Amino acid sequence: MAEKQKRLEEKIGKVPEIFKELEKTDPDLYGKVMGLDQMIWADGALSKQTKKIIAIAIAAALRDGHAVRAQMAGAGELGVKKEEIEEGLRVAFLLAGMPAYVCGKAALEEILGDRPRR
């Protein structure tokens, strides 16, 4: 597995099939996408943790359960608190409605429900 894919697997728990395929079929685009991924998730004006909360809220607003779960797993690895994710989901609810909140809330309980509060 390429070094970039190892880092991705460490961040989100697995390498999405699309990345494996892209590396084979279009290595140039793959390199650019992975570079963009590293740049976006790096600490900057916003912390990685804050970016994960934003990503969870966006995925919930899109009602993409797979993306919500993947981002939540990454958030858990970064030490994001359940209460912080809950606040992000409330923003999604305000802007995208109840279905977005329900999507995110279900994943929150599944992924981080039994996790002790910090």
Stretch-by-stretch model annotation:
Residues 1-50, 103-118:
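Acidic, glycine/proline-rich low-complexity segments that act as flexible tails and inter-domain linkers
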Residues 16, 51-55, 86:
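Non-catalytic, well-ordered alpha-helical scaffold segments
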Residues 23, 44, 62-65, 79, ...:
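Residues at alpha-helix boundaries and short interhelical turns
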Residues 37-38, 55, 72-76, 89-90, ...:
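Amphipathic alpha-helical segments within well-ordered protein domains
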Residues 51-65:
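Amphipathic, charged-and-aliphatic alpha-helical interface segments
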Residues 61-89:
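Mid-chain, well-packed structural core segment of small domains
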Residues 73-80, 96, 107-116:
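Short alpha-helical linear motifs
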Residues 86-109:
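C-terminal structural segments of small proteins and small subunits
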